[in-house]
C-alpha cells in the first residue's frame, strides 16, 4: 500500500529533504558494511568448520573459502573507500587494505564465538549468507539496468525528468546516473537480517533474536531514509529495495534450512 501511494509524493519528498546532510553522508559510507561483514563471517565459517574427514573436501573448502573471504574483504574495503572518497575527497588507496583488514578481523571474531558442537548450524548459516548475497547482487543490478530510473541528484529539470517507480525506462545498459531503482544501499542494509540467525549457534546471543530483529528494522529504516536525504534514491526505491531484500532472505533461508533439515532427518533415520 505504501509503495503504491509513494509515486504521488516521491518527487516532493526528495525535493524537500535531499540536502545531503552529514548524517546521511556517514550512513552512505557505513550502510552496507554489516552485510559484508556477516557474509565474510560465513566465509570464515566455511574455512574453520571444513570437512576434515576428506582431504579433497578439506582442501577445497580451505582454498574456496579463502578465495571468497579475500574477495569479500577486498570488495568491502574498496566500496567503503569509494564512498569515503566521494564524501571527503580523494584519500589514499592504502585505506582499501586497512578497511578490508578491519572487516576481516571482525568477521573472524564472530566466527571464533561459535563452539565446535555447532559446526553444522554455522555451515548452514554460511550457505544462506553466500547465496543470499549473490542473489541480492544479481537482482539489484539487473533491475537497475532494466528500469533505468534517473537519480534525483542527477536531475536538472526534476518535473520533466522524474519517472514513477513502476515505469521501465531501459537505457540500453547500466548507467549509474540511471540506477535509482531499486536502492542498492537499502537492499544491502537489509542484509543485516542475517543477524537473526546467529543465536542458533552463538551462545552469547541466545534469546537475543527479537532484539536483533528490531535492530535490523531500525538499521534498514535509518539507512533507507539517508538515501533519500542524499538524493541518491526516491522513497519508493528504498521501500522496494528493502522489501526485495527481505523476500530474498526468506526464500533463501527457507529453502536451505528446509533442505538441510530433511538431510539431517534422513541421517538420523
Spans of features found by a protein language model:
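Interfacial segments of alpha-helical transmembrane regions
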Residues: 57-62, 111-145, 213
